[in-house]
Amino acid sequence: MGQKSNPNGLRLGIIRTWESKWYDVDKKVPFLVGEDFKIRTLIKNHYPKSTISQIEIKRLKKSNDEFIEIDLYTSKIGIIQGPENKNKNSLINKIEKLINKKVQINIFEVKAINKIAVLVAQNIAMQLQQRAFYKAVLKSAIQKALKSGIKGIKIIITGRLGGAEKARRDSISMGVVPLNTLRADIDYAFEEAHTTYGVLGVKVIINHGEVLPNKTIADTRQIFSSQYENKKNNNKRHFVDKKNFKKNTS
C-alpha cells in the first residue's frame, strides 16, 4: 500500500539515505534523535519559509569532544547568511546554547527550486496564507515544475477551500507519479497553510525518474542546474549576417 505510506520513508535504504548521519551506542540513540529534532525545529523557526529545502546533521568526535556539522541546502543564500554572516552566526549561537556542543554550518545553494517538493509546498502554503485563489496557485506551481524537467507531479490540498463551510479535498496531477515503484525517485513534502478560515494541508509529490543501477538520486534530480534552462539555451535562434548567408547559399 505505497499510496498510504510516506514515500520518503518507504525508499530509505533503497535509493534514499538518512538526513541524520551518525552512529552511537543504543542507550544514547533516543536522546540524540530528540536532539536532532530540536535542532531542525530551531532552524525552521529561525528562518522564514521557502528558504531551506534540506537539513543534514553529521556528528563527529575529536578527542573526547562531540562536534556537530550541519549542511543546509537553500535557494536563498543571502537570507541564510545575512549581512556579514550575522544570521548564520546567531543561529550557531542558538544551537550551541541548546545542546552545549560545538556546531559548524555549511550552506549549499539550490538553483532548481521548482523541482524540490519542500520548496514547492512551502511556496503554495505561503500564497494560500496571502488569500490567493487555490486553483490558480496549484496550476502555476504545476506548470513551473513541469518546465524544470520532472517526470510528473501531484498536489493534494485539503481543508476549507475558498472559505467554504464544509472541508473537502482537491488534487491536481500531471505526468507519471508511480508511488509503488521503489526505484522511482519520489520527492514528498507536506506543509500547513494557516488562513483566517482554518488550516489547509498541502501535499506535494514529485517524480524525478527512475534511479537505474550504478546511479544515485543526484543523477535523476540535478537540482543544481535545470534541464529546461539548458534546452531553452540550445534552442535559441542564431541570426546570421545577410551577406554571409547569401555567400553560403550560393
Swiss-Prot record:
Residues 39-111 form the KH type-2 domain. One of its GO terms (cellular component) is cytosolic small ribosomal subunit. PROSITE patterns: KH_TYPE_2 (PS50823), RIBOSOMAL_S3 (PS00548). Part of the 30S ribosomal subunit. Forms a tight complex with proteins S10 and S14. Binds the lower part of the 30S subunit head. Binds mRNA in the 70S ribosome, positioning it for translation. Belongs to the universal ribosomal protein uS3 family. This is Small ribosomal subunit protein uS3.
